[in-house]
Amino acid sequence: MKHKRYKREQRTYYFESSIEVERTYRGRGGAKGKKRLKRKKPTEEQIEKQNQYNREKKLRRIIKNNFVEDDYWVLLTYKKGYRTTIKEAKADFTKFCRLLRKEYRKRGYELKWIVRTEVGKKGAAHHHFLVNRIPEGDVLIKNCWRKITGAGFPSYKHTHEEGGFKALAWYITKPPDESGEESIRNYSRSRNLAIPEPEIKRALKREMVNYPIPLPGYYIDPDSVSMGVNPITGQEYQHYIMYKLGSSELSAVQNQNGREGG
């Protein structure tokens, strides 16, 4: 679906516990009273940083649009001492998902998931698995994984216990560990995840230059506020995220920011 384009554009994404705002100035010149900065050829580092930012942002919004605070973040492992290739590990996960999907549907639910499959430096494969929670879902996951691999007990956390959606998106999309060839990043998601669509409208000039103000009942995460000129596109921008006061997502973000700051 095509949307009307504005010279100053605001895109707003609404989620259960947060609102994400992006403002962009697409004019040929700079803002009034300012000269547009000359666009420079970005470095490889800048390009990779921008690409990683976009990957993380896209996945974070997909997670927010399809999962809730008490859904499961699961670690699926193999028997101690067992070694497998990334290809074999992915095949195991595909079989596991096929079996788990049947169990969900028997109970009237659709399975939604995102997975990051890794093989560590010592060759031990494992899957970090985000999945929608249903009654007795932990038992179903354990039994299905055991049927496929013979392995025992997956470990479970709720999404807000793992730093919230922001931290999960960062972890799932982060680049591989360059310290060893066996640390491999590979993530995928189920096809039934709904892609969020933004509300698009004209942005006001004063909104582009002033520090954002939260809506009543919301808090702006200072670490999410970014304003300036994109070195790759040459466009002025302002991005920030508001979290609903009292939400588990806000608590998770504040706790995560505290750990990073410490």
Per-segment meaning from a language model:
Residues 127-131:
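Cys/His-coordinated zinc-finger cores
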